[in-house]
């Protein structure tokens, strides 16, 4: 089960928690994934502790990644990361310190001794100036060091299994190819009877095209999961 975006807004998201309670009780997921912006508040410390305690209370493994708003309050991402790692049911790891971001980690789903699925959690950072002459900041992107780490990890998992292993990527800021794919899908009429929901705002991707360097037959990535459910 996947959630994202302002799960706790200024510590006052009781209606959101009620909705999450209902969904978790009904669906009984094996894993809860938070694809960024768990909190968005000036006083992040209070909101983070409240949100972590709530999600951890379900007794279900859960895996968060950072969004572009999590670190905007009165505590930084390193403090939040430590709190994630202290939570009993949270699978979050800060990840290697020699690549970009906090929270690049992998969840391997096993069947006996074989890894049958790898869930790749990646930090897409927040925002940056793309050029020294930029007047405005733009959404950030996955760094080259992260892509190399991803390739190294997947190749290692494939070697361990002695076969190609399916994998999925979870991230917060979308890559621009998602907007291209969505626009083409709309031009072709969508999928009547299958597509549903409300698109409440425009896409907010980075400007850096990266999917070709991250997706290949040898790496066997199946899907890239973005913040698609905002409640």
Say what each PLM segment does:
Residues 1-51:
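N-terminal active-site segment of His-dependent metallophosphoesterases
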Residues 2-5, 40-43, 64-76, 127-130, ...:
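Active-site environment of divalent metal-dependent phosphoester hydrolases
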Residues 20, 32, 37, 67, ...:
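Divalent metal-coordination and catalytic microenvironments
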Residues 24, 111-114, 185-186:
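Short glycine/proline-enriched loop/turn "hinge" motifs that connect secondary-structure elements
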Residues 27-30, 118-120, 133-231:
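His/acidic metal-ligating clusters that form di-metal
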Residues 49-163, 195:
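Extended active-site neighborhood of metal-dependent phosphoesterases/phosphodiesterases
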């Amino acid at each position: 089960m996947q959630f994202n975006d302002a799960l706790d807004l200024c510590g006052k998201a009781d209606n959101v928690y009620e909705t999450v309670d209902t969904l978790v009780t009904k669906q009984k997921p094996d894993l809860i994934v938070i694809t960024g912006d768990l909190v968005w508040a000036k006083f992040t410390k209070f909101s983070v502790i409240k949100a972590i305690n709530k999600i951890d209370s379900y007794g279900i493994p859960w895996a968060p990644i950072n969004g572009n708003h999590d670190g905007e309050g009165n505590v930084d991402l390193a403090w939040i990361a430590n709190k994630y790692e202290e939570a009993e049911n949270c699978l979050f790891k800060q990840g290697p310190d020699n690549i970009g971001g906090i929270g690049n980690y992998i969840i391997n789903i096993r069947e006996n001794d074989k890894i049958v699925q790898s869930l790749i959690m990646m930090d897409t950072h927040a925002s940056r100036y793309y050029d020294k002459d930029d007047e405005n900041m733009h959404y950030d992107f996955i760094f080259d060091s992260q892509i190399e780490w991803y390739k190294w990890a997947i190749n290692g998992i494939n070697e361990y299994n002695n076969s190609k292993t399916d994998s999925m990527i979870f991230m917060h800021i979308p890559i621009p190819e998602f907007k291209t794919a969505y626009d083409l899908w709309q031009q072709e009429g969508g999928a009547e009877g299958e597509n549903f929901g409300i698109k409440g705002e425009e896409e907010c991707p980075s400007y850096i095209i990266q999917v070709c360097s991250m997706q290949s037959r040898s790496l066997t990535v199946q899907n890239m999961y973005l913040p698609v459910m905002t409640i």
